[in-house]
From Swiss-Prot:
One of its GO terms (molecular function) is metal ion binding. Belongs to the ribonuclease III family. SUPFAM superfamilies: dsRNA-binding domain-like (SSF54768), RNase III domain-like (SSF69065). It comes from Rickettsia conorii (strain ATCC VR-613 / Malish 7). The lineage of its organism: Bacteria, Pseudomonadati, Pseudomonadota, Alphaproteobacteria, Rickettsiales. GO terms for biological process: mRNA processing; regulation of gene expression; rRNA processing; tRNA processing. The gene is rnc. Residues 158-226 form the DRBM domain. This is Ribonuclease 3. Residues 4-133 form the RNase III domain. It comes from the Bacteria. HAMAP family: RNase_III (MF_00104). Pfam families: dsrm (PF00035), Ribonucleas_3_3 (PF14622).
Length: 227
């Protein structure tokens, strides 16, 4: 696990209460392990962080997209707070290197588990909020999400349509979507879909196949614009 100082530099924020930072990065698996005395993990902070993130992103969109109606703002917000975007922010922070987890969780692939990265990212937002104030948290979120907010000129329409139009304009075959994984119980499944256009491919997850396809298309569009 890397030094928290590196993470604080990436955030441009130094925690006054380091215990909050540790709690935000503590995986729930620690509670079942006898070597760890503290029963705190990131689950409660993740709950708060989800709400803080939604509030801040909503305010940013309301302020910066004055000509967009409620429906378009909701579509953009949905993209900015979806698992894929949150995990891309977590990847920018190399957050997987800082999550504190049991050896068993790590061996099982816990550092690359998107749920863990998403939850820790949201918990980190809550920890910053509790350690500082809403204004500081707002500035940090706006900085971390800046590149994704700029992309939002393309989200007036469905990302699957946008990807199809890109493929046609580039003389490629139409995108092909393939379900590659289904996890969880039938009433709370998570689907993973792979989308492929020529030699480009990307995955997306969602609670429905349709949502997973949209998220895969969004991720691939984001990649294409940065290549």
């Amino acid at each position: 696990m890397e030094s928290f100082e590196k993470l604080e530099k990436l955030l441009s924020y130094s925690f006054k209460n380091k215990e909050l930072l540790i709690e935000a990065l503590s995986h729930p698996s620690l509670r079942q392990h006898h070597e760890y005395k503290d029963d705190k993990d990131y689950e409660r902070l993740e709950f708060l962080g989800d709400a803080v993130l939604n509030l801040v992103i909503t305010e940013i969109l309301f302020r910066n997209f004055a000509n967009y109606n409620e429906g378009n703002l909701a579509k953009i917000r949905s993209y900015l707070v979806c698992k894929e975007t949150i995990c891309m922010v977590g990847a920018k922070l190399t957050l997987k290197n800082y999550i504190i987890m049991t050896h068993g969780e790590e061996v099982a692939g816990g550092r690359d588990n998107l749920n863990n990265i998403e939850n820790a990212t949201e918990a980190l937002i809550a920890a910053i909020y509790l350690d500082s104030n809403i204004e500081t948290t707002h500035d940090i979120i706006e900085n971390l999400w800046a590149e994704f907010i700029k992309v939002q000129n393309l989200t007036d329409y469905d990302p699957k349509t946008a990807l199809q139009e890109w493929a046609q304009a580039s003389d490629h075959h139409l995108p092909i979507y393939r379900l590659i994984k289904r996890e969880g119980a039938s009433h709370s499944s998570t689907f993973t879909v792979l989308v492929k256009v020529k030699d480009y491919e990307q995955t997306g997850t969602g609670h429905t196949i349709k949502e997973a396809e949209k998220n895969a298309a969004r991720s691939l569009l984001h990649r294409l614009k940065n290549d």
